[in-house]
Amino acid sequence: MKAPRLGSEEVSYSDRISYLPDDLLLRILSFIHTSDAISTSLLSKRWKFVWKMMPTLDLDEDSCRNIGTLRFDEGCCMFLKSHEAPVLTSLNLKLMTPSHDIDRLLSNIKPILHEITITSYRYSTIRFPRNLNVCQTLVVMKLQDKVLVDVSFPVCFRSLKSLHLTRVKYSCRESFTTLLSACPVLEDLDLFIGRVHYDCLNSFTIWVPSLQRLSICDESYRFRSTTFEISVPSLKYLKIACQDSCFKFVEDMPNLVEAHVEANQHETKNLLRFLTSVERLKDPDLTDRIFHQLLYLELHLHKRLNGDRILSLLKHSPNLQTLKLNEKPLRSIKDQPNISVRKPNSVPECLTFHLETLEWQGYAGRPEDKEIAVYILGNALRLNTATISRYFSSSRFRHHQKKDLKIVEELKSITKASTSCQLVLQQFIEIKYSM
């Protein structure tokens, strides 16, 4: 059998792949590690320059400590100098050994770079600006773990829209503020504060007029208290998970549509006046305020949220369409006192006109739980779906069977105000669970 022909050249059965067009070869290389993709340059002349057009580079020191006779950082510099693609969509650097040459690596990037992720497991310094071209073209920048951020000189990330800072350290208090002020069109800021030995700041000033999404997580609460001063008038999405932090919001956030707040009760009260415009809210520590725009409410139930609180929230959310209750009891039902639920004087407006979806995960079947279920199902005229789920441990499955059957029958017997409501009952088994 004769070998097939492509154009004027014979193609051997052992090397058909080499005659594929560049875009397909680049697609193939995207599925293997970058160091392996670079090694294909040794296969033949056809492969020698293909990797240089790869739109993404993933350089991981853990899987490639040395590149030939070169150290990892030296090899990276060589690769970045050799890269010829007009646009480098993504560059991912993972450093395992101490390096003070990250900025030198960045200075070797020739093409337009849109996204960069730098993860360092030993303290490594990034100094800006060393490569002004990179600073001007970046759209997404993610710095993770033991990266020391040093912004000592004026710099402008004129295209940067997303900035993630995860457990990084700052060379001085001004580095964080200077970095934010250098991002005139920033829309997304994800700030993860590490424990005390990771970063030196205990106060953060976030003044970003263009910011639309802000996420703050502070895991240092056991070691210190962190203070945040925030001015983000264009914010739409807010997530805060800080147990012992202090927040000062300088101005209102009229565009806010979704918030997830996990903070101490005092700080949550301070935040409430900024949350009255939200459409989606996840918050365990609410007080009585009117949320006219709230369409979605998710509550993680614990001892601070009893039945009275849930019904009060329904009263203060007149346009609510979706209610999600998530409960994972930490102690036995028999150890918990029965609490009678006080019904509001009038049926909440959301039950009469708007509530369409109810999800209750971890329904425990306590008397007050049943009272809440009876009240909501018996008054929600527009309810389409009510999904109620129970959790129990695999080790006590048989022990709970009879009790569970009783609870299921109780739920099925509840009279529903909405004739179109579909009641869905689910059971989930957890490995270890005290109930």
From Swiss-Prot:
CDD domains: F-box_AtFBL13-like
SUPFAM superfamilies in the record: F-box domain (SSF81383), RNI-like (SSF52047)
Domain F-box as annotated: residue spans: 14-60
Disulfide bonds: none
Residues annotated as domain FBD: 341-390
Family annotation (InterPro entries): F-box-like_dom_sf (IPR036047), F-box_AtFBL13-like (IPR053781), F-box_dom (IPR001810), FBD (IPR006566), FBL13/AtMIF1-like (IPR050232), LRR_dom_sf (IPR032675), LRR_PRU1-like (IPR013101)
The name this protein goes by in its record: Putative FBD-associated F-box protein At5g56820
